[in-house]
């Protein structure tokens, strides 16, 4: 694993339709089988750089295929050929179980 990507898609649609399209994008990302984390503003995915770039492209295509006339995608990329810190390593200490 040499990269992580945080992606936020904003399809140009009105109201609740936005949530439905974003849900479709998240379902697609889940279907890739890669380690991922859904947040309130973006979804983070870990994997191989080239595979992640293909996923970013597909996320935008899904928005269009689901009826959005256009889509804005905000993408953050962390790439290191030698490997990256995992999502778990970065956030585990902030998500301790409440007892």
Model-derived features: positions:
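Charge-rich, low-complexity N-terminal segments
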Residues: 1-99
């Amino acid at each position: 694993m040499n990269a992580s990507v945080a992606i936020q898609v904003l399809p140009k649609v009105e109201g609740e339709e936005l949530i439905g399209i974003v849900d479709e994008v998240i379902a697609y990302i889940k279907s890739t089988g890669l380690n991922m984390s859904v947040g309130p503003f973006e979804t983070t995915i870990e994997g191989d750089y080239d595979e992640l770039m293909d996923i970013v492209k597909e996320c935008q295509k899904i928005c269009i295929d689901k009826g959005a006339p256009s889509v804005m995608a905000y993408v953050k990329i962390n790439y290191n050929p030698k490997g990256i810190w995992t999502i778990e390593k970065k956030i585990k200490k902030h998500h301790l179980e409440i007892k």
